[in-house]
A protein has these predicted regions:
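Core beta-strand elements of the Rossmann-like FAD/NAD(P) dinucleotide-binding domain
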Residues: 8-11, 182-193
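N-terminal Rossmann-like FAD-binding beta1-loop-alpha1 element of flavoenzymes
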Residues: 13-41
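Short, well-ordered coil/turn residues at beta-beta hairpins
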Residues: 17, 191-193, 197-198
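Glycine-rich FAD pyrophosphate-binding loop
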Residues: 32-56
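Glycine-rich active-site loop/strand segments that organize a redox cofactor
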Residues: 61-97
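Mobile, glycine/GP-rich and aromatic-enriched active-site lid/loop segments adjacent to catalytic centers
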Residues: 102, 109-164, 169, 241-393
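Glycine-rich loop(s) and the adjacent beta-strand/alpha-helix scaffold that form part
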Residues: 196-256
Length: 393
């Protein structure tokens, strides 16, 4: 049996995890730690540049209030979250996140994130609260900021170290233990404060992907519920972590639908029932007041599609071809401009996947599917336990 070396690391702040939340915590904490002479240590079970839920990239930022230009107020955003989650929300926490998010986005842009802008230099919105980005390297940019901040403060980063248990002193978490996935080393991290940012939990429920596709999921398959385990073990409050998130995505490869619904204004239909948002509109009356707000809560939109599926009217489709043609129609009297716009929209459709879900682009290519010519199947994913998209906090 291999002889394992025990490595003891002493620090003031221990950050467990290496995704977006951990990198953000490291960047902010290091700023203050440097002034106070404190040490920050970050431990990632993967490699910081491409770890976490944003490892493959993103094609949009899904929360931007627009305070600088007076687009919305914090109260507007609170009302939106309350409506979308049908009243199940911790509004104090939502408010606290919302008041900081714009300045964070501006930092991302300063660090090198490409945010779409129009001819007037204004951000291009996907929807009221979303910004379009070229985000294939999103995580790399944020990881670089965290690395620089930790280095400047004299802290440490440990990669390929799998944290398995918190260290408890009574009811206080004072560190964590874990092992290297590359070397025969067992780590004992001793800290005065610990941040658990290790993602949510996937594969708790049976995945839709089976056979050769087994293991493919919308949420990263590497997220094994470590944050929940740490929280429970340490006796900390679990706010909204019980929320099960069921996103609708393009079937099989889990490509994003946000740009299609919000930017391209696409419709979703069922094979045998048509536009279920129109046909089943009366069902929304049963969910007042939330069924009557605009935009209609995401879970109710999904529910109406699932009703069609349960009645044997499925599968569901995203009308990509119709959406692209509708946008290009404004140039129908100018064949040259029409052709140019069609190519531009086709490029944006593919880029949406290449920025954040490359597997969906590969699937389209493998099927020789052209979004401007044929619609694509969409489906609800299996449920996930996930921090950020619980939305309620």
């Amino acid at each position: 049996m291999a002889n394992w070396e025990t490595v003891v690391v002493n620090t003031d702040l221990l950050i467990c995890g290496g995704g977006f939340s951990a990198c953000g915590a490291a960047t902010e904490a290091s700023y203050w730690a440097k002034k106070k002479g404190l040490k920050v240590t970050l431990v990632d079970k993967a490699a910081l540049d491409r770890s976490g839920a944003v490892a493959m990239g993103l094609s949009a930022i899904n929360q931007y209030v627009g305070l600088r230009d007076g687009e919305n107020t914090l109260e507007d955003y609170i009302r939106y979250v309350r409506s979308d989650l049908m009243g199940i929300s911790r509004e104090d926490l939502v408010y606290n996140i919302a008041r900081h998010v714009d300045s964070t986005v501006h930092l991302f842009e300063k660090w090198g994130l490409k945010i779409w802008k129009d001819e007037k230099g204004k951000y291009v919105h996907e929807g009221r609260w979303q910004l379009m980005i070229n985000g294939e390297s999103y995580k790399v940019i944020i990881a670089e900021a965290a690395k620089n901040a930790i280095a400047a403060a004299g802290g440490e980063i440990f990669e390929r170290v799998f944290i398995v248990d918190p260290l408890m002193d009574g009811n206080k978490c004072v560190g964590a233990v874990g092992f290297s996935t590359r070397e025969n080393k067992f780590y004992v991290f001793k800290a005065k404060a610990v941040i658990a940012g290790m993602g949510g939990a996937v594969h708790v429920f049976r995945p839709r992907s089976v056979g050769e596709g087994f293991g493919r999921s919308w949420y990263p398959p590497f997220n094994s519920g470590s944050s929940a385990y740490f929280t429970i073990k340490a006796g900390a409050e679990m706010t909204c972590q019980e929320v099960r998130f069921i996103p609708v995505r393009f079937k099989d490869a889990y490509g994003p639908v946000g740009a299609w619904f919000l930017l391209f204004k696409s419709r979703a239909i069922s094979a045998g029932g048509g536009d279920y948002m129109v046909v089943r509109k009366a069902e929304l009356e049963n969910w007042k007041p939330y069924g009557l707000v605009k935009p209609i809560p995401a879970n109710l939109r999904n529910y109406l599609g699932m009703l069609d599926t349960e009645k044997g009217l499925g599968p569901l489709y995203m009308e990509t071809d119709e959406a692209i043609k509708n946008i290009a129609a404004q140039f129908k009297d100018d064949p040259k401009a029409f052709k140019k716009k069609m190519k531009e929209l086709e490029s944006e459709a593919w880029e949406d996947f290449l920025d954040m879900t490359i597997s969906q682009a590969i699937l389209w290519a493998a099927q020789n599917l052209k979004p401007e010519e044929k619609h694509s199947e969409i489906a609800a994913c299996e449920p996930y336990f996930i921090g950020s998209h619980s939305g309620a906090s």
